[in-house]
Structures are given as C-alpha cells and as structure tokens.
Amino acid sequence: MKELNIALLGLGTVGSGVVKIIEENRQQIKDTINKDIVIKHILVRDKSKKRPLNISQYHLTEDINDILNDNSIDIVVEVMGGIEPTVDWLRTALKNKKHVITANKDLLAVHLKLLEDLAEENGVALKFEASVAGGIPIVNAINNGLNANNISKFMGIFNGTSNFILSKMTHEQTTFKDALEEAQRLGFAEADPTDDVEGVDAARKVVITSYLSFNQVIKLNDVKLVGISDITLADINAASALNYKIKLIGKGTYENGYVNASVEPTLIHKNHQLAAVENEYNAIYVIGDAVGDTMFYGKGAGSLATGSAVVSDLLNVALFFESNLHTLPPHFELKTEETKEMMDGAEPVVIQEKSNYYIVISNNNKSLEKVEYDIKKKLPFHKSLQLVERDQDTYAIIVTGIETSPEKVLNQSGFNIKKVYPVEGV
C-alpha cells in the first residue's frame, strides 16, 4: 500500500487532535484513501515538553528545515499558528511542490490569495477547512456544494466564546463580566479575551468567507467591527421583550462588485434559525441564488472538532493525490460584463436595500407613547416600529423596513442616541 508522508507543524490542542484522529481511525482512513498516512516529522517549539499523547514513535524536531528539505514529504499540515515566520514556511513548502493544509485563520486573513496563487502555480493543494468554523465544513460547502450558485449574502455566529457569553446573559441573567469569567474557567476564553469579545477572531473568519463566497479579496480593516463588551442585561432583556436575541454576527453581502462586511452585535428574531444557536456552537447562514437559504451548524473550536476538519482536508488531498487537481477556486467569478461596467464607471450603481435597526435612546422624561409619536413623525418611511422601556433612563426601539440609518435623522431631531445595532431575521 502506498504511503502518504506528512509533516505536522505544531502539537498543541489542534495538533494533538489531528494525531489522535489519525491513530484511532487509521484503518478507516486506509480503506477510504487506499493509502497509509505516515506522520514523518512533527515540528515543535520544545522537544522536552511533557505532552498528553504518547509520541515516542514520532520524530519531533525544532528545525523547520528538517521538513522543508525532506523531498519525501507529500503534505505539510500547519496547526502551529502565527503569521511570521509561518507564512514563509508555507510559501517554501508550496514552492517545493508540497501540498499544504492549514487551520491558521490569522495568517489566511492576510495571505490567503498569495498562498492560493502559489498553490496554483505549483500544481499543489492549499486546504483550510479548519480555519473558518472548526468542525463545520463551510469551506467545502461553499467551494463545492454551492459552486453552482451566486452567493449574495452570508451571516453567522463565527465565535463560540462570544456566543457562550451572550447565551449565559440571555438564559441565566449573568452579567457580561461573570459570563466571561465562566468562559475562561471552562477554557472557552483565553486569559486575554480581546480577540473573541471584540470581534477580531470573527472578523478574520469573515475575511476568509468573503473571499470564498464572493471571489473578492478584502482586508481585516475593511470589516466594520463592534464587539460585545458594551452589551448589558438591559439590552438582552429589551431584545427579549421585543421577541429577539442578541448575537455577535459576522456578515458579508455582495452588490454590484462590492463587498460589505461586518462583525457586530445583531438582534436576531427568535423565529430565525440563528437564534437557536447557543453556547459555544457556531452556525453560518448562506444565501445562494439557486439553492436559497442554507445553514451550517456545529462546534467551531476544540481539539477533535478542529482536528476533524484538518484530517478531512488531508483525506481530500489524498483522494486526488495522483491527479492534477489542486485546491478548487471559489465558485465562478461573479463579475459579469454588466457588473464590470458598473465597477469601471465613475458612479457605481447601488441597489437600495431595506434595513432594520435596534436603537437605544434616552427617554428625556417623556412617556413611551410620546416618544413613539415623535419618532414616527421624524423617521422616513418605515415598515414597523416597536418600543419598550429598556431601563429607567432609556427606551429600546426596533424599526424595520427603512432605507437609511435612522441615526442621523433622530440626532438632528434632538433624540439622544446611545446605541444602534442591526436587526436580522425579521
């Protein structure tokens, strides 16, 4: 039986999961790909470190050149993390005709197009299923399952830590601070939780998903970013009274050749599927022109969940190992001649979409009825308006079916706006 030699970069949480899955499912893997996977090298930072796995049969090295210069290595699996010098290692591996599998969202959010071009130039695969949503096979779904669709929008819960915190606040009336501390105790949140609670982790995944969905390269700075640290129980309870839940939603839309991307607290109607996604689970909702609405759900992190996605990529590469296939590009180019003309023109055509908003305003000692009356007079045409008392000083409002953000109009009319979040699933 042919052997498939792989090198593993990293033996932390995900790397250990990869080794465990390969060891425990070795016969099933052999039956699937008709090849035996051999882990020839494992790159670690400290060979003397004690590890939960028995790794005595593996060659551990602290020298990346042991891997890059080994011509027998077929696939490099990178689960070490970091951008530098990791990107240089992966570039060298691709140039040396080695397939690359990575779970590194930080790196891909910056260098995905560069690495994909290198893979194509060298006739090898670049796979990154684990980089977006752990065990959820969203990359394969978009690249292959939905490749007959023009995708116009995706939105989802991309970060399990923030979703766990919001679930605790919603169902147990826990404060943000206490929910975060529990997430840290359970290992869902890092000692420094900034990337999770301020939306940076989700934004990196939105950058990757935008490239997959729309075949457009955007940067992290292109993503509108608002975290959940300002969400209070007053917001949670006001949303509930209005029949909504608050989730940290990553979203991308594609119109006339342009991508709009965001990560921000969003009110999701309780009847929408995303509202039912709780605790550390992730879900991604994708809208295609042919298939309509689809949703992908599962655990977005963890040793075995993420390791499963890595090994899945490994098997997919192995199945096509003797062919000329390499990583599939995102679904066909969305820039038709018509949209190219729009993009090349001085004034791009903009499709006006109706939007929905959650707004918190000071009550200014006015009754709920008086505030509702005043807002209806000042706002441009809208579909519906709901108001509740948020706390003794503020009212919470949901306005739907409006063409422009109500923030400017209400500010000019003397309303003191405290917060504005989008609303979905109406």
Whereabouts are the PLM-identified features?
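Rossmann-like NAD(P)H-binding beta-loop-alpha module
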Residues: 120-201, 208
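A conserved regulatory-domain signal marking ACT and ACT-like small-molecule sensing domains
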Residues: 314, 320-426
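Catalytic, metal-anchored helix/loop core of enzyme active sites in primary metabolism
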Residues: 153-155, 163-166, 170, 182, ...
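A short hydrophobic/small-residue beta-strand
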Residues: 99-101
